[in-house]
């Protein structure tokens, strides 16, 4: 039974991925930061132990700005995950990134404003310990090994991905104005979403490998001339592509190295700095 509550890879995604796992065990995990979005669902994918966490909770009841990102990443690490895949829906900021495009970003820009985004905030933990001030590098926020696995998996499924680009993360839950969208595009950014930060930053602080896979579900307001983005259209395009994305995730999981064989810098992100708290 102990094996059933352990995983080496985490996947944070939407409700369309529940059927992703075989032989599923549901596990409730408590964290010093409160409960994660939902239970962890642990099972096997391509012979690998995987923990799936529904980012918005069952029934999609958590808006992006109210997701407990710190608890989510902490929970995944606590069951053994050291590599995390984070698929999410985004809007395309350029006409060439239309609905159905899979973009694997290599950068992000944070335009959120109210989300706790670090474990090292100097505030006491419930047990009284106080984290030290720690500054991790986020120059390259995504795991190079995970990105390579995701790109190879997509190509193997005959879905040519966009290799690289910048994901701008906004607060939500509203969609952007045309002025905001045009400004994002003018900066040279590629896609816009609501959940990519602080996942990547928190994963780095926990020395986890994190890879974002963004599925374009719509052209953002500044890239189209219609009535703007609608939630219904986002859901329709996501549903039309979820099977393909599941297949890419399946193959990416199979291609990731064993946790003890990681050769990327993610596992040494703290660089020997003392976090002042016991990581799970």
Curated annotation (Swiss-Prot):
It catalyses: a purine D-ribonucleoside + phosphate = a purine nucleobase + alpha-D-ribose 1-phosphate. Pfam families: PNP_UDP_1. It comes from the Bacteria. GO terms for cellular component: cytosol. Phosphate binds at residues 15, 55-56, 195. GO terms for molecular function: S-methyl-5-thioadenosine phosphorylase activity. InterPro entries: MTAP, Nucleoside_phosphorylase_d, Nucleoside_phosphorylase_sf. The keyword Glycosyltransferase applies. Substrate binds at residues 194, 218-220. Pathway: Purine metabolism; purine nucleoside salvage. Its EC number is 2.4.2.1. Keywords: Glycosyltransferase, Purine salvage, Transferase. It is an enzyme of class 2 (transferase). The record marks 231 as: Important for substrate specificity. PANTHER family: S-METHYL-5'-THIOADENOSINE PHOSPHORYLASE. Belongs to the PNP/MTAP phosphorylase family. MTAP subfamily. Although this enzyme belongs to the family of MTA phosphorylases based on sequence homology, it lacks several conserved amino acids in the substrate binding pocket that confer specificity towards MTA. Purine nucleoside phosphorylase involved in purine salvage. Homohexamer. Dimer of a homotrimer. This is Purine nucleoside phosphorylase.
């Amino acid at each position: 039974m102990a094996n059933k509550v352990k995983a080496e890879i985490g996947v944070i995604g939407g409700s369309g991925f529940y059927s992703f796992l075989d032989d599923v065990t549901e596990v409730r995990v408590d964290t010093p930061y409160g409960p994660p979005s939902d239970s962890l669902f642990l099972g096997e994918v391509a012979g690998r132990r995987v923990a799936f966490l529904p980012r918005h909770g069952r029934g999609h009841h958590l808006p992006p700005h109210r997701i407990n990102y710190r608890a989510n990443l902490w929970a995944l690490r606590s069951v053994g995950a050291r590599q995390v895949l984070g698929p999410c829906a985004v809007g395309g900021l350029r006409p060439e990134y239309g609905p159905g495009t899979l973009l694997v970003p290599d950068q992000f820009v944070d335009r959120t404003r109210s989300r706790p985004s670090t474990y090292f905030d100097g505030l006491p933990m419930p047990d009284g310990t106080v984290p030290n001030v720690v500054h991790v590098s986020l120059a390259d926020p995504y795991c190079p090994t995970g990105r390579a696995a995701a790109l190879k998996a997509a190509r193997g499924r005959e879905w040519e991905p966009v290799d690289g680009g910048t994901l701008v993360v906004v607060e939500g839950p509203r969609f952007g104005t045309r002025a905001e969208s045009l400004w994002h595009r003018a900066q040279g950014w590629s896609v816009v979403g609501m959940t990519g930060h602080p996942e990547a930053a928190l994963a780095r602080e926990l020395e986890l490998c994190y890879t974002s896979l963004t599925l374009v579900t719509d052209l953002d307001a500044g890239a189209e001339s219609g009535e703007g983005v609608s939630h219904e259209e986002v859901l329709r395009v996501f549903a039309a592509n979820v099977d393909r994305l599941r297949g890419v995730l399946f193959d990416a999981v199979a291609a990731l190295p064993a946790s003890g064989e990681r050769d990327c810098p993610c596992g040494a992100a703290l660089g020997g700095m003392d976090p002042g708290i016991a990581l799970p």
